[in-house]
Amino acid sequence: MSCSEVFSRYAGASSIHSLSRLMIRRLALRAVAATALTLSAQLAHAGKTLDGVKQRGVLQCGVGTGVAGFSAPDNKGRWSGLDVDVCRAIAAAVLGDPEKIRFVPLNAQQRFAALQSGQIDVLSRNTSWTLTRDASLGFHFAAITYYDGQGFLVAKKYKVTSAKQLKGAQVCVQAGTTTEKNLSDFSRTHNLGIKPVVFDTFEAAFKALFSGRCQAYTTDASGLASVRNKEAPNPEDYLILPELISKEPLGPVVRRGDDEWFAIVKWTVFALQEAEELGLTQASVDQARSSTDPSVQRFLGVSEDTGKLLGLDKAWAYRAVKAVGNYGEVFERNVGAKSLLKLPRGLNKQWNQGGLVYAPPIR
């Protein structure tokens, strides 16, 4: 091989190497630019919800259309329930007043569109946390406020004592819910040939059971207790079957892209749960501000300012508990022993009492 041939080959290899390095540099610059654009978009959106709530002076909270124990208005139009109290706690933490709130009743078909469009700031409406909803709708599930499962309500006159006896039965169910899909899966798994009778609203579905249109009605077990005790013509004529056919972790939902607001909603729920573990109640929280317990001092903002990490002031957690009480109080008042539903705590007990409620440390 001549010197000229060697040089030619070397020059060609060198050119290819230089070109490769140039392409790598260009790709790297594009990646950096894309990352910068993403970060700038996130930063531009960060805090948008909190700013809007503060400017408006009102929290817009999406709730159910009338589920006793969770979200329902009384005859004077005042809302109450576990989901409602979560929103009141958020309003207290953010705006300093649990009454600075507008409740927006939404059915299952309306709820996600209302959140996506910005009609509401937070959705607190017995909504199950699933992979599909979490990954594809552009939402964050902030926390779990109630561990539930799907069950069945039947009229005792049908002599049904197990869900597996519902072969060929007409079962009332609400459209656009995980309940509808779970019913189909349960029917196929056990070869029951269940005939779903689908309704657009919660109310229409359970009323069809009472009118005799269906042999059973299915929804979350907590909802069944609500319907049986509050809506049935005679509660003693109806039975909640023992089987739960799904896991239904319920909790508040926010839009993706606003990490600050996501953190505020999440940590407000954790504050209610942590308050119960610390023994802080709605009645005792004022006196507790003079406590020498470091955990209590930190929680109430006496010794540390955790609120600045959330864009709030140091008394945010104090106000949330003062407004609605701790998680145990919220539970018992709305769905537990002090309510019409009389539901047991079950999985909704604190972690150190055999339940699943476990708040990360507020510190």
Where in this protein do the model-derived segments appear?
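N-terminal signal peptide c-region/cleavage motif recognized by signal peptidases
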Residues: S40-A41
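Extended ligand-binding regions for polar small-molecule ligands
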Residues: D85-R88, A92-V94, K157-V160, K164, ...
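Acidic, polar ligand-binding/catalytic clefts
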Residues: R88, A92, G96, K100-Q165, ...
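C-terminal functional modules
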Residues: L309-R363
